[in-house]
Design a protein with these regions (language model features):
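Generic N-terminal leader/processing signal
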Residues: 1-3, 22, 59, 73
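Short intrinsically disordered terminal tails
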Residues: 1-5, 85-88
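Short aromatic-glycine-(Arg/Gly/Cys) micro-motifs in beta-strand/loop hairpins
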Residues: 2-14
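Compositionally biased regions
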Residues: 8, 19-20, 24, 69, ...
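Polar/charged side chains located within well-ordered beta-strands of beta-rich proteins
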Residues: 9, 17-18, 35, 63
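A short, exposed loop/beta-hairpin motif centered on an aromatic-Gly-Thr core
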Residues: 12-23, 46-49
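Short, surface-exposed linear segments at secondary-structure transitions and domain or protein termini
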Residues: 25-35
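Short, mixed-charge low-complexity intrinsically disordered segments
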Residues: 37-88
Length: 88
C-alpha cells in the first residue's frame, strides 16, 4: 500500500464573519458535515483539484471521520494535512 499526502483548503463558517478560534471538537464537528462546495482546493505532490471528484471527497470524509488529519486556521480558512493509504 502507498501513502499519499493531501493538502486541503476549505472555508470554515460564514465567509463574511470568519473565525479563527474554534476548539478541536468544533473543528471536527464542522469537518464531519463538510460539503464539497466548502473545499476550495485539494493538492498532492503531483495533482491539484478545485472541482473535487466524488470518490476523492468520500475518501477525504472517511479520513476526517477517523480524525486522521492535522489542521491550521486563519481568517476563516482551514488548511488540512492528511495522509491516506491507497490500495494498489
Amino acid at each position: 500500500m502507498k501513502k499519499l499526502k493531501f493538502n486541503v483548503e476549505a472555508i470554515i463558517g460564514d465567509r463574511y464573519e470568519s473565525t479563527d478560534l474554534l476548539s478541536k471538537n468544533e473543528v471536527h464537528n464542522w469537518l464531519v458535515n463538510i460539503q464539497k462546495q466548502d473545499i476550495l482546493k485539494v493538492e498532492t505532490e503531483n495533482d491539484y483539484w478545485e472541482d473535487i471528484p466524488q470518490d476523492l471527497f468520500e475518501l477525504l470524509k472517511t479520513n476526517i471521520e477517523d480524525k486522521n488529519y492535522n489542521y491550521t486556521m486563519a481568517k476563516g480558512h482551514l488548511w488540512l494535512e492528511m495522509e491516506i493509504l491507497l490500495e494498489p
